[in-house]
Structure formats: structure tokens, C-alpha cells
């Protein structure tokens, strides 16, 4: 089993446990250059809010700061944006789905920023 398969196996187990809870899910995906966050409905079929470093507004802000989307500063910005969008959609509490990634670096920065912006998990 290689690194990617192990990550996907961990993600699958987490998603099964979150589905049993029947709560909204904040899913995070990261690549070398970008980070993405989505809030899914409790049934898991609808995306209620999303934010990523591909959005034009985010890219403009990042160009002023660092010029890149694959760093902790970008993850912090995405964490704040996803919390604001989730609250606007009426979501106060979510389950955090790190998609099998270690809770470290960019994933941790996104989670901490979302918590500071008022999202509970």
C-alpha cells in the first residue's frame, strides 16, 4: 500500500464515522500549490459552502502577500473564508474531515483559522 492509498483509506474511515454523526462536514483537500475547503450537508450530498486558493479574490490577496497558494498564510485565509461562508449559510457547528492528511502545517492552520472565525468543531 503506497502513501496515497493509505491516505485515502484513512479518509474513508473518517467519512464513515462522520456520516454516522449526521452533522455538517468541513472537508479539506490540499495539493502542492493549492488548498480547498468545502462544507457538506449532513447527508453528504450538497456542498453548502466552499473556499479555495483558486478564487479570484483570494488570489488577489495572496499576490499582495506571498504570491503563492500552497503555504500556511494561504491556508489561514481559506480557513477564515470558509468559516464566514458557513456562518452565512446558517452552519455553526461542523465535523472536521482532514481527508487523511496529517493534522499539521497547512491543515492545522486552516482548522485554527476556522475556529477563530467562529466555526465550532
From Swiss-Prot:
Pfam family, one: Ribosomal_L18p
GO CC annotations, alphabetized: cytosolic large ribosomal subunit
Function: This is one of the proteins that bind and probably mediate the attachment of the 5S RNA into the large ribosomal subunit, where it forms part of the central protuberance.
Family: Belongs to the universal ribosomal protein uL18 family.
Subunit organization: Part of the 50S ribosomal subunit; part of the 5S rRNA/L5/L18/L25 subcomplex. Contacts the 5S and 23S rRNAs.
Protein's recorded name: Large ribosomal subunit protein uL18
SUPFAM superfamilies in UniProt: Translational machinery components
GO MF term (any one): 5S rRNA binding
Keywords recorded for this protein, A-Z: Ribonucleoprotein, Ribosomal protein, RNA-binding, rRNA-binding
NCBIfam families according to UniProt: L18_bact (TIGR00060)
Biological process per Gene Ontology, one example term: translation
Amino acid at each position: 500500500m503506497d502513501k496515497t492509498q493509505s491516505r485515502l483509506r484513512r479518509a474513508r474511515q473518517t467519512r464513515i464515522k462522520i456520516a454516522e454523526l449526521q452533522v455538517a462536514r468541513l472537508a479539506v483537500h490540499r495539493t502542492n500549490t493549492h488548498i480547498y475547503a468545502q462544507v457538506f450537508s449532513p447527508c453528504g450530498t450538497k456542498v453548502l459552502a466552499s473556499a479555495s486558493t483558486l478564487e479570484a479574490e483570494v488570489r488577489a490577496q495572496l499576490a499582495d502577500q506571498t504570491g503563492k497558494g500552497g503555504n500556511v498564510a494561504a491556508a489561514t485565509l481559506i480557513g477564515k473564508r470558509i468559516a464566514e461562508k458557513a456562518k452565512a449559510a446558517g452552519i455553526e457547528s461542523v465535523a472536521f474531515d482532514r481527508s487523511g492528511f496529517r493534522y499539521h502545517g497547512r491543515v492545522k492552520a486552516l482548522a485554527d483559522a476556522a475556529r477563530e472565525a467562529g466555526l465550532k468543531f
